[in-house]
Amino acid sequence: MTQPLDGLKVIEIGGTVSVSAAGKKFADFGADVIKIEPPQISEVRKIAPFPDDIFHIDKGAVHLAFDTSKRSIVVDHLTNSGKEIIQRLGSKANLIIMDIPAKEALDLINIFKDGDSLLTNIVTITPRKV
């Protein structure tokens, strides 16, 4: 059975609940979502409850609720090599959603610019001061 968003490619950047929930909605409706997680443990993976109240990076209820139906890769978006990976993935995406500090988001947005126009659609979840 086809889904409404079949064929849509979405890149999710950041480890917060808001970006994970947004990405989950796209995935639930058939989009191909690639979650780019930070090298440090993301916020979503740290949130309890955990089975038997014992922390485990892959077993938190919030992570299991919001990070299913996605592919995942760990990338440091602050490094040049990380930006290259994100540029390659993002160049094939229809949409990029991110919840990272504004200065970091602006750096990433600039890698998708072609002159004065963006090459892909980008949505930032939480506006923050630069």
Model-derived segments and spans:
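N-terminal helix-loop segment corresponding to the beta1-alpha1 unit
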Residues: 1-130
